[in-house]
Amino acid sequence: MREAPGVQLYDAVEAGVPTDVVKMIARATGEPASVIMGLAGVSQTTFVRNEAANKPLPDVAGHRIMAYLRLLATLRRMLDESGDPEQMKTFDLEGWFARWVHEKLPELGDKTPADMLRNPEGQRAVEQVLERMRGGLAA
């Protein structure tokens, strides 16, 4: 039986999200690594300690990082399906998303999408905002 991508992601998170993923996101978005650490809810001290010991992020931080990546992938898929291919060639999706996650949204009770990454219900609420944006509805 072939494993589904969801199972592969589950296994990857269970194995532990490497600290390098934080640096990868920082490079892709242009955000300082400290901002990405803040999204994950991991202190600089913990990050540096885990990085030096070649240990993964703490479980909760790893789940938040994966939620961030999942939301970014959802947005990319939505734009690939319905966006203008010419505009997409020059659109800085990662940079736009990095700014957007820090904007307070009325649809989220004036919380930021970054705040909502703290638990699965908040993550679903952000996914719903993205889906409504795609449909052209007021989020």
State the predicted function of each range.
Residues M1-A139:
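Non-transmembrane "mature" sequence context
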